[in-house]
Amino acid sequence: MTTTATAAELGSRPVPPLGGFSFTVLKLEIRRLLRNRRTVIFALVTPSIFFLLFGLNAAYANESAGKGNVSAFILISMALYGSVLATTSGGAMISIERAQGWTRQLRLTPLSPLAYVVTKMLTSMVLGFVSVLAVYIVGFATHKPSMPGYLWIVTALCVWIGSLVFAPFGLFLGYLLPTENVMQFMGFIMILLAFGGGLFVPLSQYPHTLQVLAKFTPLYGVNQLVHWPLTGGSMDMWWVVNAVAWLAIFTVGAIWRFRKDTARV
């Protein structure tokens, strides 16, 4: 059977419900991800260390910040960094599957590009949840962050949901970059985005031009939204527009690269 004949058969194959999305496949993907100890440990340890370094500083940790203190503000920031790092890392692991030829084999199945991207995004979100939980446990154990009890839950959920924006970004990088370089590039890119979105340094300390440019970066909207329950004030709809727009851009990019990669079968 020729490749052309196979492609013709695939084209006439009926599309299954939900584009081939399967909870069985989702469970397998989650297990595969959690077995990667290096990625899991990196996602858990890095943001927790950052919080311990910056969130416990006696010079400012107890200063007021909205409904809590600065330590609580930094806790949310580091949890967000860890969560987006985890979801991006989980997605970027697709580069390993590409090297093994797995994604090309998927072209022989009825699984749609959107269903595959959604499966990978949900898998990455599991790692993101574990990362958020780890940072919040460390923060709670130090007794330094101060905010109302309900905000511990609300902000943690906001951080986790907000990290969804970066799940398809990891997939996009995994399809775009070579296997041997994807993690190095990803780490560098995430640090730049964190600074650009005001995650490590308050945007108020940036020059005016950088403050304006920051509003168009991928982490800006999510960063503002996850801190809003703590800081209060009026919500800027641009935060939502920014987050939704980048989620759409990254998702379209991931689907495009998936189709381009599997089209080589």
Task: Please tell me what each predicted stretch does.
Residues 1-12:
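Short, intrinsically disordered terminal tails adjacent to the first/last structured region
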Residues 113-187, 233-244, 248-255:
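Alpha-helical transmembrane segments and their short interhelical loops
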Residues 53-60, 174-216, 220:
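Transmembrane helix segments
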Residues 55-59, 96, 139-140, 144, ...:
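Transmembrane helix-loop junction
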Residues 93-125:
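Helix-loop-helix units of permease transmembrane domains in multi-pass membrane transporters
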Residues 24, 28-32, 104-108, 174, ...:
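Short amphipathic alpha-helical coupling elements at transmembrane boundaries
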Residues 10-100, 128, 132, 144-155, ...:
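Transmembrane helix-boundary elements of multi-pass transport/secretion proteins
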